[in-house]
Amino acid sequence: MHQYMKSIGFGNIRDKKQLTQIIKDVEESYTQHQLVTQDEATDLCEFDKEYGEGIGIKVCGDMDIDEQFDYRYYAPYFKGSGVTSYADVSVERRIDREAYVGICEDTKVGINLVFYLQNMMEYLRERQLGGRSIKYSSVTLSGLCNEGTILLPVRKSKEQEREQQEEVHNRMLLLSAARTGDPQAIESLTLDDMDTYSKVSKRLISEDVFTIVDTYIMPYGIECDRYSIMGEILEYRLTRNEITREDICIMKLDVNGLLFDVCVPKREVMGEPA
């Protein structure tokens, strides 16, 4: 079973038979159905079915000229809201199947963000019309989460918040300059990182890491599109899986200046957001 089926309320699937029934339900009573031509005899087919507000399952495969569907794979999804980043986005096809990943480097985080492309069919149609040189300048991110913990925020004065915002802004400017090959910017970033490492190492001797760090995003595990994150909760609401009746928490987070939504089963969230 896909590891993140749990995040949309299907964590109690016990065997392959139950999973097959769910996939069959998506194929037969879908919310949305899309086709993209592959060749004269075959279309790439995608069935989407929503099981709650913004959460659902995609089933992808091939549809032949006789409308016979050949199943390839399935994946849970969660639709985010708003624009997360206005950085340039590039798209690459996965090696093992007809699925795509997006890559963008936002100066707020300073790393390449790799993500699974949710609107694959729209991308393929645009590529057929406009060729392979499609460029995107914004992206809406969303996250599937299996568990989470609510922490008390780090206490800051107004002056500390203002100073932090200035530091973040200055770092973004340095990162932008470093990308163009500016040696002074590269040197400044290197010295800043060394200074930060030294300060944090000293504080960790007597303080807990969560009293020092209030937001982060970093790769998790060996797969390129999995991350461990911590951020400020800006909005919080509940939805429910229509089949399992499990409550799902939907939270809008501010993570290193990136705004995006995540969904996580309520029973797997430790603590209550204020």
Pin down the residues of each PLM region.
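N-terminal alpha-helical "arm" segments
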Residues: 1-40
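Long, hydrophobic alpha/beta structural blocks
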Residues: 38-234
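Short amphipathic beta-strand/extended segments with alternating polar/hydrophobic composition
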Residues: 113-115, 261-266
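Generic recognition of flexible, low-complexity loop/linker segments
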Residues: 217-220, 237-240, 272
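OB-fold (S1/OB) nucleic-acid-binding surfaces
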Residues: 235-262
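Short nucleic-acid-contacting surface segments enriched for D/E, G, S/T with interspersed K/R
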Residues: 267-274
